[in-house]
Amino acid sequence: MSYEVKVEDVEYLRHGNTPYLATIYRPQGSGPFPIMVELHGGAWCRSDRHGDKVIHEALAKSGVIVATLDWRQPPTAPYPASFQDIHYGIRWIKSRAAELGGRADMVGSMGNSSGGHQAMLLAMRPFDPRYSALPLPGAPALDATVRGVIMTSPVIDPLGRYRYAKDLKAKGGPTPVNPDELIPCHDAYWKTEEAMDEGAPASALERGEKVQLPPVLYLQGTDDGAHPRPHLDRFVAAYRKAGGVVDLELFEGEGQGFIMRKVGSPNSTRALEMIIEFTHKQIR
């Protein structure tokens, strides 16, 4: 079944005189519909909520309420500012779930690249006081727990990717990514290597940190030079060892961002189908 979708922009948060918007995709029907909070990529320091529109529309047409967020970014707002805004955004969407046609207990999160990292780490640490620092007026009891997480080519190891980019720059020559774009974003957002490691999901698991373990769908291309395969393998092994469930799908020959860059291709279509199927299975 394909639903008609209503789209609206709503201010969900304000810092000083700066509003931060959510774009809400609402399937038109009786519901209740699952809700997916989607987080854009951009190495934590650029891009906005409109970057993954194809995914937003596909989910909404399948009967999912999608909320895609903007948040504070460097240079004015390093880690953990974006986590505070996203944490607030998840609670905010839960507070509006009924009027949107959903339920507060039917919420998941997903993200691409750095957005995937933020979705995963926040899902693991929904009760971290650093992240929950912004009070939500009228709904103090709501939390930011989610029923499932979808990651598409996440920066799952910030420190590992930082060192990978610095190594590429030192070697010179052609590179699969531009280290002169990545390195400054890591520096601006994280400030230190210690913070990058503290904010790495696999590191948290390996330290024995007590975390939440929602089910995960992890999608990535085998030729993705921006998100090294060893980082993926480390996280998946650590998450499964801790008792979490990860559905991992590797797309042969695909590079970074293939879902958006190759819309209509067999692999992009299959990835969208998997995202839709996982959402309806887990967020209910």
Please report, for each region that a protein language model flagged, where it lies by residue.
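Alpha/beta-hydrolase superfamily serine-hydrolase fold, recognizing
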Residues: 1-284
